Structure formats: C-alpha cells, structure tokens
From Swiss-Prot:
GO terms for molecular function: haptoglobin binding; heme binding; iron ion binding; organic acid binding; oxygen binding; oxygen carrier activity; peroxidase activity. It comes from the Eukaryota. GO terms for biological process: hydrogen peroxide catabolic process. This is Hemoglobin subunit alpha. Residues 1-141 form the Globin domain. Displays a pronounced Bohr effect despite the lack of the His at position 146 conserved in the beta subunit in most other vertebrates. Shows chloride-dependent sensitivity to organophosphates like ATP and 2,3-diphosphoglycerate (DPG) but not to inositol hexaphosphate (IHP). Binds molecular CO(2), not bicarbonate as reported for other crocodilians. It comes from Paleosuchus palpebrosus (Cuvier's smooth-fronted caiman). One of its GO terms (cellular component) is hemoglobin complex. Involved in oxygen transport from the lung to the various peripheral tissues.
Length: 141
C-alpha cells in the first residue's frame, strides 16, 4: 500500500518525466530488450534498432499508461483495468516481465534525475511500479 509520502514522492519524480514520455519510454524499452533479450519475443514484428519509430511509439504508450496511473494513483485498478485485460487475455505477457520493465524504469530515472532519485523516492517509485505490476497481473488468475 502506498503511503501519502510515497504518493507525493512518485508525483514529484514523475513531474520531471512528463515532458519526456516518448524519450524515457524508448530508453526504457531499449534497456529492457538489451538487458533481458528474452523479452523481445513479444515484439517479433518490431524494428528493435536504437531509436526506431516502433520502439519510440511503444515506449510512449508505456509511459503514457504510467502517467495515467500516476494521475489516478488512488485508483490504479480502475485506471489500468483495460490494460490488465489486454495483457492477460490477448497479449499473454509473462508477469515476470513487468518486474523487469519496472527495473528499467528505475534505471532511466536514475540516469536522468540522479539528484531527485533519493533512496526514499527510489523506494516509493519501486512500490508504485510494483503496485502497477500487481494490477496488470491481477486478471491472470
């Protein structure tokens, strides 16, 4: 459960990303595919080269969804219900991949905002991403 301090920390660090959703999203996916190459199997039709239009487009979608989750931090289930259905029933993404993606999101924030990603903010952002992952995998059962 996210505390009020966690919510404040997440909103604060996220405000630094809201103007860079496509860039941060693309960088997150590129890191995901490089560090965890097994995740590429979900994107066989994508051009996975650096800065490709498909990676930028999907990265932006991922970060727009996270942006929406931040804006609805008190109702993550409602905000992410459609995406939960999509990933569980249509895409059938292995739930472990959400944790891998979350790790890459944390790295991107650390790279771009090292001073803002204090240990407390890091912990809050990690808790938030875990909460998002829990919602996205809730319909797998």
């Amino acid at each position: 459960v996210l505390s009020e301090a966690d919510k404040s920390n997440v909103k604060g660090i996220w405000s630094k990303a809201c103007c860079h959703l496509e860039d941060y999203g693309a960088e997150t996916l590129e890191r995901l595919f490089f560090v965890y190459p097994q995740t590429k199997i979900y994107f066989p039709h994508f051009d996975l080269t650096h800065n490709s239009a498909q990676i930028r487009g999907h990265g932006k979608k991922v970060f727009l969804a996270l942006h929406d989750a931040v804006n609805h931090i008190d109702d993550l289930s409602g905000a992410l219900s459609r995406l939960s259905d999509l990933h569980a029933h249509n895409l059938r993404v292995d739930p472990v991949n959400f944790k891998l993606l979350s790790q890459c999101v944390l790295v991107v924030f650390g790279v771009h905002h090292p001073g803002a990603l204090t240990p407390e903010v890091h912990a809050s952002l990690d808790k938030f991403l875990c909460a998002v992952s829990t919602v996205l995998t809730s319909k797998y059962r």
